[in-house]
Amino acid sequence: LVAALVGGCAQVVAPMQSDGPVPAYLVPAFRAAARTYGLLSAAQLAAQARVESSFDPSVVSRAGAIGIMQFLPATWAEFGIDGDGDGVADPRDPLDAIPSAARYERHLADVVGRLPGDRIALVLAAYNAGPAAVISAGGVPDYAETKNYIARVNDWAAAYAAEV
């Protein structure tokens, strides 16, 4: 186990394991979102969902982030879409949250993508820490939580590459 300092509290982070498959019903949504928004791959989007919520759409964080992709209400209000066409854009509905996350990350790429560094790492950092933190740092901020987030997403994306 690896201990990371998060918000002044020690958080125990289990090493990435290959026993967390992508739920089969979500694979088409990850693929469609990757095709539509053209930034993160389907495996990277699935990895984000794994890191954010372990694919649990009912998760609500202490900060109030909701659903499989952990949207804050204000971010959802701006970027949330009705991905499944049922007439309701709901951050708890993975079929809405997945394309909404890809849409938001396309926006983040426009905001932070010109900073020095890997564009995907910058977008993941902005998703995790907020675009203002990335802009202020001039790149990926030196936050243990954010660096750990990027590493975990990359690890899971590699694990999911053949699956998604």
Regions picked out by a protein language model, each given a short descriptive name:
Residues G64-I66:
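Flexible, surface-exposed loop regions and adjacent strand-edge segments
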Residues S53-R62, G130-V140:
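Secretory-pathway/luminal and periplasmic proteins that interact with or process carbohydrate-rich
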Residues S18, A89, P141:
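Conserved short-loop catalytic and cofactor-binding motifs
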Residues R62, L115, P141, Y160-E163:
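Short, polar/charged, Gly/Pro-enriched helix-capping and turn/loop motifs at alpha-helix termini
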Residues L5-P57, D110-G113, E163-V164:
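Export/targeting segments at the very N-terminus of extracytoplasmic proteins
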Residues Y25-A32, T36, I68, P73-S136, ...:
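Alpha-helical segment that forms one wall of the substrate-binding/catalytic cleft
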Residues L1-V2:
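Sec-dependent N-terminal signal peptides
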